[in-house]
Curated annotation (Swiss-Prot):
Protein name from the UniProt record: Large ribosomal subunit protein bL9
Keyword Cell division listed: no
Name of the encoding gene: rplI
PROSITE patterns, per database record: RIBOSOMAL_L9
Keywords (A to Z) from UniProt: Ribonucleoprotein, Ribosomal protein, RNA-binding, rRNA-binding
Amino acid sequence: MKVILLQDVKKLGKKGDVINASDGYARNFLFPKKLAQEATDNNLHILNNKKENERRQKLAELEAAQALAADLKDKVIKIDGKAGDNGKLFGAITSKDVAGLIKKQFNVEVDKKKIVMDTIKIAGTYNIEVKLYPEVSTKMKVMVVPVQ
């Protein structure tokens, strides 16, 4: 019997896969636990529509991320940090601080975990990488200006 998996099932397949299962296994295990449904023409049509909509949505998200990456590319984030005479900062600048400044200066929400950088402890200019989507990232600069 052909069935459509509604959830990931070990040793059978992933959600959305159409597989062959024995009649007893499908009726007595997969259907009662809502792990699968019968692969009728209507159900297959619905599944194909869902997959097409997901594909379109991912493509739109990818294009939006690429446009955002082009906008943010080589932008400079300026930070005024209290520093001593030798340029060493009182405290440190972390990815959380940079994410807040990106939101403030460019009105773009970026998760702090998506910013690849070392903690900044000395005034200067630093290169960072911002990951906007799994395959899309952009380079930015952080300029730390010492303030007495």
